[in-house]
Swiss-Prot record:
Taxonomic source organism: Mus musculus (Mouse)
Pfam families membership: SNARE, Syntaxin
Keywords: Cell membrane, Coiled coil, Cytoplasmic vesicle, Exocytosis, Isopeptide bond, Membrane, Neurotransmitter transport, Phosphoprotein, Synapse, Synaptosome, Transmembrane, Transmembrane helix, Transport, Ubl conjugation
Oligomeric and partner information: Part of the SNARE core complex containing SNAP25, VAMP2 and STX1A; this complex constitutes the basic catalytic machinery of the complex neurotransmitter release apparatus. The SNARE complex interacts with CPLX1. Interacts with STXBP1. The interaction with STXBP1 promotes assembly of the SNARE complex. Interacts (via C-terminus) with KCNB1 (via C-terminus); the interaction increases in a calcium-dependent manner and induces a pore-independent enhancement of exocytosis in neuroendocrine cells, chromaffin cells, pancreatic beta cells and from the soma of dorsal root ganglia (DRG) neurons.
Protein name per its UniProtKB record: Syntaxin-1A
GO cellular component annotations of the record: acrosomal vesicle; actomyosin; axon; glutamatergic synapse; membrane; neuron projection; nuclear membrane; plasma membrane
Domain t-SNARE coiled-coil homology: 192-254
Membrane topology, record value: Single-pass type IV membrane protein
Amino acid sequence: MKDRTQELRTAKDSDDDDDVTVTVDRDRFMDEFFEQVEEIRGFIDKIAENVEEVKRKHSAILASPNPDEKTKEELEELMSDIKKTANKVRSKLKSIEQSIEQEEGLNRSSADLRIRKTQHSTLSRKFVEVMSEYNATQSDYRERCKGRIQRQLEITGRTTTSEELEDMLESGNPAIFASGIIMDSSISKQALSEIETRHSEIIKLETSIRELHDMFMDMAMLVESQGEMIDRIEYNVEHAVDYVERAVSDTKKAVKYQSKARRKKIMIIICCVILGIIIASTIGGIFG
């Protein structure tokens, strides 16, 4: 009979090599994944820093009736940078999401997959938080610009309600603000100049908000769905804890009852033994 020991040993060594290769490939994949996570986190931090700088630019522009062009250009550059970086983050998060969905579609489940899902969820939430802050900053700036326009209109003797002013802004026509204003004083001219400046800022702002709206809603819906999933997990965990606690309690009761039953059984055996001794002694006395 042919000795196949060497052949089997070679096959085993080959299998071991395959296992090592798979492990190394998986480790390399996770290393690359964590590098990507750090890159995304860096992008999100950059957006957060830019949002704070945008707030400072807003304050500087509002502090001056006619802000210098340099400040306005710097604000536009910041807004453009936020948009570009946000699109990068969204693209990378989408790529991770698709990779996770593919593995889930193949019914694969591993510690690595759970880690990736957790990291993706954390980054998505952080991204939505910083973009929510940016959106709130833009909305606040719009309201402040709107307030300045309303005050300048009052200076010219024209009173408007908030709804009327909103209609004027939505028209997108700067000339509508000059309607009914008597341009016979430098005060009226200066007021109209600031109105036009603020209106121009609002138009740029609304364009930026529209550009980011779809992306923001897409990510917000993703995070909301993740939140529902996390809530379900927490619910299941809480109920699992309750179940375990009840099981422990029931086990303690069972042990207690079992202990009592065992003691009763021992007492019965002892009584039987004693009774047997008494009967044996009695019979012995009779026949003795």
